[in-house]
Structures are given as C-alpha cells and as structure tokens.
Curated annotation (Swiss-Prot):
The encoding gene: lsrB
GO biological process: one example: transmembrane transport
Annotated protein name in UniProt: Autoinducer 2-binding protein LsrB
Keywords attached to this entry: Periplasm, Signal
Location relative to the cell: Periplasm
Lineage: Bacteria, Pseudomonadati, Pseudomonadota, Gammaproteobacteria, Enterobacterales
C-alpha cells in the first residue's frame, strides 16, 4: 500500500512537472503581417517586432503574402486565428477588405492591431501610426519645396496603389497643401507601381519620359522612391527633385551619388517594437484607453490618441491610435547614422 502511494505521488509529481513545463512552453503568440514579404521596409518592421517578442518572452511570427492582396492577407489572418494565435498585427492593403476576417477574429478573442497601414477603426483595437496624414503630407511637400525654387512647377505623384489606406491619406493632404501654398505647381500625373520593383521602375521611367519638363516626383512608397531615383539615373535626369519615403539602407547609394537630396521616413524597427509592446499590454489587460500611456524600454513613453487624429469619426473604449514619437528627414549629413 505504501509502495502504491509512493508510486502515485511520483506519478502526480511527474504529471505536475510536465504540466508546469507545458505552461512555460505555452508562450503567448503574436502574428506580425506586412503588406508583402521581400521588401526591406517591412522586413525591418518585422525585425523590430521579433526583437520586442524576445524581450517580452512572446513568440512573434513574421509572415505575409508574396503579393499585396486582400485575399492573401485574409488567408494569413484566418490561418493564424485557427492556429490559436493570441494577437494579430497587420499592415492592411485595404481599409475595409480585411474587416470581415478581422471582426471574426476579434469575436474569437484575438487581439487585432494595425501598423503602417490602417483598416477602418472598428476593425481593430489600435493603429500603430507613423504619423498623421497631415504630418506626413506636409513633410512630403516641404521636402519638394526645399528643391523646387520656382513659382510654376510640374509635379508627379508616384506610389503603390489607388486603394492602400496610408499613402492615399498622405497624398490627399499633400495635394491640399500644394493647392493652398504652391498654387503655381501643376500636378501632371498620379501613377502607381503596385509594390512591384520591376513595374515601379518601368512606371517611373514612363513618367520621366512623358514629362521631360517635370520638376519633381513625390514618391511616398518604399518601392516607388528608389525606382524613381534609379529611373532618373538611367535616363540621366540630374535636375529632378525626387522625394518620398523609403528606408535609409535602400536609399543610401542614391543620396551618396546626389540623385536624391533628401527623403523621409520614421524608425520602422521602432514601429515594429511598439506594435508588439502595445499588443502585449492588451494581452496583459493593462489600461489602454485614450490618454493612457505605455513606457517602452529604449523608446520611451507612447500615448493612446483618439481616432480623430487620423481623421476618423469612430471612437470606442479600447480603441485608438498610438503615434510614433518622431519622423526623420535623411540627407548626406545624417544617413550613415541609420541602419535599417
């Protein structure tokens, strides 16, 4: 009887240790989804997200479609939900195309956040936002104005697609600023590269050939901006102001050769980190309503702002925008200080 009791105790102890081990292994899991894989900008964001995951003891999976499509992102969202992920952070290719899948995920208890490019606010809890449309639209025009020093000028807009949320918001604000502050600037065309490097280069060359007297290309897209710079070099257009948003590692050779005088962005590695820290706060049931702040190691304090900062009319408890602390203009003097 005593031996039987000892065996039972040993078995229960072993079971308890096994259960404890399983509990330790069952780390929370977060999926971090870009618009597409294979683009340095998104890879850098994913690196930041995974660094934050390691610091927090959270399993962060970086995966995205090979082409920027709603169907590709929806499939990934559904797969992650079915695999039992606790949170999904997505850079949406469409403001409303992902909403049915994201709402289903939320109904199943999955925390949904967006980064880089937002959905409609009712389809997520928080948007980790690089800058308001007004901030980024103004930044684009101001960079162009630093180089276009004449009253009458011809300007082209060139970016990823006519449906992507973030870039269209920035361009809308940029065009409004041009209309108000540079009425002599003519916007001669708005064209798209659809996040494809080859198509972007072809489109950029087509713009430059079609408008030989073009003064500036404004390209707020990680593929479009280097494509515009490469097109200008291929066609030997040295007098063209080329500005926009991309990563310093991609743009460094164009800046060093003088093809691009300045361009902007934000620290996308930092954006990935903030996204995971905010998701972790949600999973830990920390207060995250408008006005609440979160201290992030190595970054500082970030605060939840209302959706109205982004021009939305939807507000709800547990819903808002977390704005990155700063944006950066890169040029010859500072570009080598950055590595992403």
């Amino acid at each position: 009887m005593a031996r039987h009791s000892i065996k039972m105790i040993a078995l229960l102890t072993a079971f308890g240790l096994a259960s404890a081990a399983m509990t330790v292994q069952a780390a929370e899991r977060i999926a971090f989804i870009p618009k597409l894989v294979g683009v340095g900008f998104f890879t850098s964001g994913g690196n930041g997200a995974q660094e934050a995951g390691k610091a927090l003891g959270i399993d962060v999976t970086y995966d995205g479609p090979t082409e920027p499509s709603v169907s590709g992102q929806v499939q990934l969202v559904n797969n992650f939900v079915n695999q039992g992920y606790d949170a999904i952070i997505v850079s949406a290719v469409s403001p409303d195309g992902l909403c049915p899948a994201l709402k289903r995920a939320m109904q199943r208890g999955v925390k949904i956040l967006t980064w880089d490019s937002d959905t409609k606010p009712e389809c997520r809890s928080y948007y980790i936002n690089q800058g308001t449309p007004k901030q980024l639209g103004s930044m684009l025009v101001e960079m162009a104005a630093h180089q276009v020093d004449k009253e009458k000028a011809k300007v082209a807009f060139f970016y990823s697609s006519p449906t992507v949320t973030d870039q269209n918001q920035w361009v809308k604000e940029a065009k409004a600023k041009i209309s108000q502050e540079h009425p002599g600037w003519e916007i001669v065309t708005t064209q798209f590269g659809y996040n494809d490097a080859t198509k972007s280069l072809q489109t950029a060359e087509g713009i430059i050939k079609a408008y030989p007297d073009l003064d500036a290309i404004i390209a707020p897209d990680a593929n479009a901006l280097p494509a515009a710079a490469q097109a200008a070099e291929n066609l030997k257009r040295n007098n063209l102001a080329i500005v926009g948003f991309s990563t310093p590692n991609v743009m460094r050779p164009y800046v060093q050769r003088g093809t691009v005088k300045e361009f902007g962005l934000w620290d996308v590695v930092q954006q990935g980190k903030i996204s995971v820290y905010v998701a972790n706060a949600l999973l830990k049931n920390m207060p995250m309503n408008v006005g609440d702040s979160l201290d992030i190691p190595g970054i500082g304090k970030v605060t939840v702002s209302p959706n109205s900062e982004q021009g939305y009319h939807y507000e709800a408890k547990g819903n808002g925008i977390v704005l990155l602390p700063e944006r950066v203009i890169f040029n010859k003097d500072n570009i080598d200080k950055y590595d992403f």
